[in-house]
Structures are given as structure tokens and as C-alpha cells.
Amino acid sequence: MNNNSSSLSIGNKLFKSRLLIGTGKYQTLNQMQESIINSECEIVTVAVRRVQSSESSHKGLMEAIDWKKLWMLPNTAGCTNSEEAIRIAKMGRELAKLSGQEDNNFVKLEVIPDNRYLLPDPFGTLEAAEALIKEGFVVMPYINADPLLAKRLENIGCSCVMPLGSAIGSAQGIRNESNIRIIIENSNVPVIVDAGIGVPSHAAEAMEMGADAVLINSAIALAKDPKSMAEGMCKGVHAGRKAFLAGRLVEQPLANPSSPCTEISKSSYVQ
């Protein structure tokens, strides 16, 4: 979408921050809280299945976040088919309401039957998206970097598309650059690069390409110093966005001197 607006528009909500972060994988809730603050994010994802399970790592998570300041993005992580994703999305909407966000219909849609590579199922994602949109959800689908699928999801009413930069948690950065560029160029909804971002330069690269936002979890939560990495990611996103808006110098194969070469004697050149 890459418009020049200072705000990120998703559904009927406007956000100043273009960095979304996840709440999983932190060693402690305190680390998560500090990282959220340093990231300056406004949207945090919550894995509905994990929050409602007995996993000790997620106990107290909902209470540790100030939902008056942050917008909850329930996600369907762990769902392997469309039926399961639809059910978990509805549970996520109720979870958001319980946190005080009565008008929150957001869902990050993940349908991942593949446990090894964690690649999203395009057919299951499309099927679930169609059903959830009919039920009033603001659907934010996680997809492979497939321009045709991205356009199809936009056309059925998804509020954004979230192509992966590379495999989840791989920290490989943007490995699907050409396809993501096509998605950005042809999209009329925000494009949020999700998965694979490992360092701030990866986040900056995504934003320089014209992505509207990035979503990051593992790179922050599993860093040696999560709160410092969160700050770095925040600055990377800002830098990349500014570079995109400024308009970068076009790459070219030959040198182009920054100082004039007029009135320089030919004899002064090194032979």
C-alpha cells in the first residue's frame, strides 16, 4: 500500500507505530513488559490457544499488559486447518472483550499444518478468511509471499496482508524480496512483513521496500538483551520508513562523482 500517511490504518483503527510485536518466548513477563515499552509499539499479538492453555510461560500474561494503552491482536497460532482457526478466532474476540476492548474484532489469521517449516496453508487461510470476514472480523492473514494470494485475500475483504520475509524464527531476513515488492506495488491494503526478521537492518530493509509495518517476536524475545533489541527494532523501522518516504538514490552500475569534474586538466588524472 505504501502511502505517505503518518499513521498506519487497519480496519477502522489508526496507529502511530509501524512495529507490531509478539508476546511469546520471553523468559519472564518483566522482559516482555520492558520490550513492549522500548519498542514503542501499539499492537501486540496474543496466541489465544497458549493463553487459554496451562502453559506456565503464559500465566499472568493478560494481566501483565495494560490493555488501555495497547491494542490486542489475537492470533490463531497452532491451528492446522480452517475450522480450527475460525473457532480460535472467535475465542480471541471474546478474550479481547474481556480485556475491555469491546470493539476489537481483529484477528491475525494463521493456518499452519506444517510443523517442520511452519509454512502457512494458502487454501485453509483463504477459506477461514472468507468465513471470518462474513462474521465481522478484521482479518490480518499470515501468508507466504504469493502476490496472487495476497490480491485474492484483499479482494474478499482482508484488512491487510502479512507475507513472510523468511521462515518463522529463522532470522534470515527478507528472502522473498521480489515477491514482496510485487505485493506492495499492487496492494490497496497495508502490507505487514511478518516472520524471519532477525536484526534491525532487516526491519529497515522491509520498510525501505515500502512495507507499511513489520511484526517481530523471536528476534526480540530471544535476544540476549530483549529490551535493547526492541529499541533497536523500533529505530530500524523508523529509519526504513524515513528512507522510503525520502526516496532513495537509484542504484546504477557506474560511478557518479559528487564533485564536478569540469576544468580539471586531463593530465591530472592518474594514468
Curated annotation (Swiss-Prot):
GO molecular function, one term: thiazole synthase activity
Catalytic reaction list: [ThiS sulfur-carrier protein]-C-terminal-Gly-aminoethanethioate + 2-iminoacetate + 1-deoxy-D-xylulose 5-phosphate = [ThiS sulfur-carrier protein]-C-terminal Gly-Gly + 2-[(2R,5Z)-2-carboxy-4-methylthiazol-5(2H)-ylidene]ethyl phosphate + 2 H2O + H(+)
Active-site annotation: 108 (schiff-base intermediate with dxp)
Chief subcellular location: cytoplasm
Keyword Cell membrane annotated: no
Pfam family, one: ThiG
Known role: Catalyzes the rearrangement of 1-deoxy-D-xylulose 5-phosphate (DXP) to produce the thiazole phosphate moiety of thiamine. Sulfur is provided by the thiocarboxylate moiety of the carrier protein ThiS. In vitro, sulfur can be provided by H(2)S.
Assembly and oligomerization: Homotetramer. Forms heterodimers with either ThiH or ThiS.
Pathway: Cofactor biosynthesis; thiamine diphosphate biosynthesis
Source domain of life: Bacteria
Sequence similarity: Belongs to the ThiG family.
One of the GO BP terms on file: thiamine diphosphate biosynthetic process
Name of the molecule in the record: Thiazole synthase
Key words, A-Z: Cytoplasm, Schiff base, Thiamine biosynthesis, Transferase
GO cellular component, one term: cytoplasm
Subcellular location: Cytoplasm
Keyword flag Transferase: yes
Binding sites annotated in the UniProt record for 1-deoxy-D-xylulose 5-phosphate: 169, 195-196, 217-218
Enzyme Commission number, as recorded: 2.8.1.10
